[in-house]
Structures are given as C-alpha cells and as structure tokens.
C-alpha cells in the first residue's frame, strides 16, 4: 500500500516524463525519416480534406532519380511548418485564393508539361496554374475532397526542383495529373 501511495504521489512527474519521452522520440523519428530539401518534393493543398499519406505513397511510385521522399500536406499543417509551406514545390488552391498566394507561384514552362495537360490559368499573360478540379471532377479525386468551386495546381516560387537543371517538380505535376 505504501508503494502505491508513493507512486500516486509522484504521478505528475511520471506523466511529464512520459509526455517528454513521446515528444522526444517523435522529434527523433521525424529527423531520421525526413530527407533534405534537395531530395524531397512537397505538395501543399488548401482543400476540405486530403488522404495525405496515401497520396504521397502513390506519388512516390516511379519517383525521379535523386528524390527520396514525396510529402503531401494540407494547409492545416502550416502551424507546424510555415517554412515548409513557403518552400513547397507545388500548391493546390481554390480559385478564390489565387490572388492571396500569387506571389508564391512561378510561371509554368509549357514545354515541360505533358501534352494532355488540362486547362491552364493565365496570370499576367503567362500560364501559371493548371485546373485540377472543375467543381465536379478532376485529378486525384479518390485522395482529395476538394470542396466547392475550381481548384488549380501551381508551381512554387521557391521550389528547388523547378529550375533548368532539376525539373522534378514537373515530374510531380505529371504524376499528379494522371491520378483519378
């Protein structure tokens, strides 16, 4: 009885250690399983809901050489990783949010897009976004609940994979457009 009383009197200490241990191991696991920015592709989506893990696994199939990881996040994830949002390779946003994020987008290189690319959104005279949801149907509908209205896919302005020497972001665009 005395041992039980002693344990219960120190329960708060045990709980604090338990929480710190879980957070610490979660942090270590994140570091071990993550990849450097040069070796991962990141897609952020401002959608109703997204099956992010399933979509990431599907997009990782046949990934380009040099890419170790594809991450998919909803915009809700921003509270944990604002820098990740700013450096994302691709964004999916509703038509109503395009103006809000327009400084985060790069113009698309039409020569690197697949020939069957859906309708393009023009901003300031150049192709900038690809319509991936028209309000009723579109790309990756089995992974994403888009919500009302049209949604567009954009190339991130800070993407490390959209330059002349590395076009893995265009591979990710093509892989995403093929999903149903």
What spans do the regions from the language model cover?
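Solvent-exposed, polar/charged alpha-helical surfaces in well-ordered, non-transmembrane soluble domains
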Residues: 57, 81, 99, 170-174
């Amino acid at each position: 009885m005395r041992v039980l009383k002693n344990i219960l009197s120190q329960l708060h200490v045990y709980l604090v250690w338990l929480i710190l241990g879980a957070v610490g191991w979660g942090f270590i696991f994140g570091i071990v399983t993550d990849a450097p920015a040069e070796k991962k592709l990141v897609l952020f989506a401002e959608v109703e809901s997204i099956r992010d893990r399933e979509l990431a696994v599907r997009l990782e199939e046949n990934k380009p050489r040099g890419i170790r990881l594809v991450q998919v996040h909803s915009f809700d994830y921003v509270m944990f990783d604002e820098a990740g949002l700013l450096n994302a390779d691709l964004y999916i946003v509703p038509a109503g949010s395009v103006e809000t994020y327009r400084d985060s987008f790069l113009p698309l290189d039409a020569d690197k897009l697949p020939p069957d690319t859906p309708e393009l959104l023009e901003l300031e005279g150049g192709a900038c976004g690809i319509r991936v949801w028209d309000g009723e149907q579109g790309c990756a509908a089995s992974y994403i609940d888009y919500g009302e209205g049209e949604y567009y896919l954009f190339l991130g302005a800070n993407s490390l994979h959209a330059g002349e020497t590395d076009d893995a972001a265009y591979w990710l665009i093509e892989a995403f457009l093929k999903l149903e």
